[in-house]
């Protein structure tokens, strides 16, 4: 029987008294770990964060917190080879894991470096300029940010067990707010391995971070207006959390990043044979095969001119023919497994729902050729490309198949594209692939209000582009509407989400003394 993963509670590792739930290897079906939070004292966790972790972090200046983050990232970087080995059990290939593991550690380094450059060596963060209020200049105002005295609870998704934790932890540490990490059960064993190294590093003060390995229990019952809930996952779970009394009655801050029917738009100028057409086809294939399509930023709707639909299908199909699906431990494999058999069933059901409006033009959602694996025990699925010839159908704008699946949707006139993009009702990211500046300008104007991020991809930037689906720590990640209405990352913007903005009023000398010593 595999080990029962421990939670880190009030300075001690806690192992539940029962057998817990078994977590399986996504590729082989073998048991990897067990998880349980039976009898976990969640009140003690929140109290410890507020009374021990928070004060300890707030005794550090912004610069000292930045140094602690660098020490932490350095320690994790030294151990990342072990994380990569463990990550294979999640179904991810080694290349997939780079985005999660190296990306998470790299994000921590970026936050440390940006903080060293941009934040003061103090405890108070000025926001904007001094505002003259009195006629004689003796009375002024100044907005400032200070650390929230509560706790940040992060509830994370299964697809990024390392990056998902670190990209939330880093800005919270800089803000001086302690964190409780609650990973998704399916991949909690990888988060747990990283968490043990975080604690062992000693880079953060005691109480700055705690860990719940299993269900959250009644943790939200102890949160209120001084606290932050940072969630990544499904829209349905976000709705449940958003409706909790911690948010609705006690006004805890709630930030959500949820499902997203992201689109990629091919411009009318990007016909077969142009660099932009080739870039578009390559991007589609990369998006639906990276992490087996299990990224919240994955392209779900491919909006293409009706005149090039057949060319796009041919181009995507030719590239997908080269994809090797199977056990990620085999170096010839280029696409691994979905996270679980349950997740594969969910994706197949979603594809069936999409097939009410679309037809499969590549792949078979129920059958796949595998290397070093079998589809009975491993959660494997072939890449699937669908075509929804009638762009008035609602299904592609409502159903997300969270796997290696995307749907082609044709458009006849450029004026239609903005309307089609908006039907996703809010997305994390969209991309525009075109070399026509007029088309790009029109698309940005119409699509930007519905997206948290827009990639404009063409031959001039392709060599350095980080791609449609990769959030960068310097840029905001999140989106309106269906995408959750939240925002994270974006450099030092992320730090302010864990702080309180207050307007100070007083004499210029007092305000200057307060802010100047920040």
Language-model features, listed with the residues they occupy:
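Short, well-ordered beta-strand elements within core beta-sheets of diverse protein domains
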Residues: 19, 31-38, 54-58, 132-133, ...
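Short loop/edge segments at beta-strand edges and connector loops
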Residues: 213, 362-364, 458
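ALDH superfamily catalytic-core signature
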Residues: 75, 197-202, 226-228, 237-391, ...
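Rossmann-like NAD(P) dinucleotide-binding subdomain of oxidoreductase/dehydrogenase enzymes
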Residues: 119-279, 411, 464
């Amino acid at each position: 029987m595999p080990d029962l993963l421990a939670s880190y509670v009030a300075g001690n590792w806690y192992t539940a008294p029962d057998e817990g739930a078994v977590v399986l290897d996504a590729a082989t079906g073998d048991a990897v770990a067990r998880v349980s939070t039976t009898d976990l004292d969640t009140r003690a966790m929140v109290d410890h964060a507020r009374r021990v972790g928070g004060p300890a972090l707030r005794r550090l200046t912004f610069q000292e917190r930045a140094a602690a983050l660098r020490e932490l990232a350095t320690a994790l970087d030294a151990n990342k080879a072990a994380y990569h080995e463990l990550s294979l059990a999640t179904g991810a290939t080694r290349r997939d894991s780079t985005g999660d593991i190296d990306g998470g550690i790299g994000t921590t380094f970026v936050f440390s470096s940006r903080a060293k450059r941009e934040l003061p060596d103090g405890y108070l963060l000025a926001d904007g300029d001094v505002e003259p209020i009195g006629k004689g200049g003796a009375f002024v105002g100044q907005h400032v940010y200070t650390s929230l005295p509560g706790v940040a609870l992060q509830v994370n998704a299964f697809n990024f067990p390392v990056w998902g934790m670190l990209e939330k932890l880093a800005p919270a540490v800089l803000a001086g707010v302690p964190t409780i990490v609650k990973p998704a059960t399916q991949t909690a064993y990888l988060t747990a391995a990283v968490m043990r190294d975080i604690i062992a590093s000693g880079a953060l003060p005691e109480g700055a971070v705690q860990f719940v390995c299993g269900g959250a229990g009644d943790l939200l019952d102890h949160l209120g207006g001084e606290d932050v809930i940072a969630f990544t996952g499904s829209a349905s779970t976000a709705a449940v959390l958003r409706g909790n009394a911690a948010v609705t009655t006690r006004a805890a801050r709630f930030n959500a990043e949820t499902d997203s029917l992201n689109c990629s738009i091919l411009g009318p100028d990007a016909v077969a044979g142009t660099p932009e057409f080739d870039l578009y086809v390559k991007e589609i294939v990369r998006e639906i095969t990276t992490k087996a399509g299990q990224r919240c930023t994955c392209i779900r709707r491919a909006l293409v001119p009706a005149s090039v639909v057949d060319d796009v299908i041919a181009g995507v199909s030719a590239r997908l023919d080269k994809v090797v699906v199977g056990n990620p431990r085999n170096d010839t494999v280029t696409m691994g497994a979905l996270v679980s058999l349950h997740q594969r069933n969910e994706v197949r059901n979603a594809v069936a729902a999409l097939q009410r409006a679309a037809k499969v033009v590549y792949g078979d959602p129920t059958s796949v050729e595998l290397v070093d694996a079998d589809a009975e025990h491993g959660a494997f699925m072939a890449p699937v490309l669908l075509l929804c010839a009638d762009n008035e159908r609602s299904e592609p704008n409502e159903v997300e198949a969270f796997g290696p699946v995307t749907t082609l949707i044709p458009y006849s006139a450029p004026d239609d594209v903005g309307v089609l993009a908006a039907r996703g009702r809010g997305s994390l990211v969209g991309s525009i692939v075109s070399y026509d500046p007029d088309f790009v300008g029109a698309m940005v104007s119409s699509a930007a209000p519905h997206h948290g991020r827009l990639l404009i991809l063409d031959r001039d930037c392709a060599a350095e582009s980080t791609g449609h689906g990769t959030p960068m720590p310097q840029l905001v990640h999140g989106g309106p509407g269906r995408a959750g209405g939240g925002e994270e990352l974006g450099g030092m913007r992320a730090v302010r989400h864990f702080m309180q903005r207050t307007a100070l009023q007083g004499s210029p000398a007092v305000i200057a003394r307060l802010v100047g010593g920040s």
